[in-house]
Amino acid sequence: GYLHYGMNRIDERVRRILRSDFGYRVGVLASEEIKNTLGTAMPDKAPKDVIMHATGINLAKRMPVNFDVETKPVLDACEDVVGELARLVNTVVDSAPEELSADLTDAGAVLTGGGAAMAELDRRIGQALGIPCRVADAPEGCAIRGLYRIMENPEAYSAMLMDRQSRQVW
């Protein structure tokens, strides 16, 4: 399986909750800021009384307004996606070759991508896998840096590249 749109699904859910439950429309950047400020991958450990000020459109009045966003709806939006992500990562690791599983057990996993910066995501994934887990330095640029390395020396990485015929990584 895969998680379509990755952590951006949380942003979409935040926008949907604010619109349907509270009558506010916010943009993509605002919902991402709300997620980054109030969201966490460990909702049980999150403070419940945090409030963030946001700007959006009051749909009833069709006017721009400042309003407060509470933690709970954001944590709810995070939990569904993070829970699904943890299950998917666990499934991938369970089906990994023995050598990779041994490396993961010894060295742990490294989270990459912009969503890796979510508060406590490394702990949540580490708990789901039962191995150490950390966030890469500058995680949002890892895919581009990796692609650049492959393009510089494709022969060195040919064994790891996906076979177009089989569409299998291993």
Residue ranges and their predicted role:
Residues V14, V89, L111, L147:
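Residue-level signature of catalytic and energy-coupling elements of molecular machines
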Residues R164-W170:
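A short, charged, Gly/Pro-tolerant segment at domain boundaries
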Residues G1-E79:
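Phosphate-binding glycine-rich/basic clefts of nucleotide- and phosphate-handling proteins
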Residues R123-R149, N153, Y157, R164:
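Conserved phosphate-binding/catalytic loops in two-lobed NTP-binding clefts
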Residues R25-L29, P139, D163:
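Interdomain boundary/hinge elements
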Residues G1, L111-T112, A136:
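Thr-Gly-centered strand-to-loop micro-motif
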Residues G39, P43, S101-I125:
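Glycine-rich phosphate-binding loops at beta-strand->alpha-helix junctions
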Residues A77-T105, I150-P154:
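Phosphate/ATP-binding catalytic cores across multiple sugar-kinase/actin-like superfamilies
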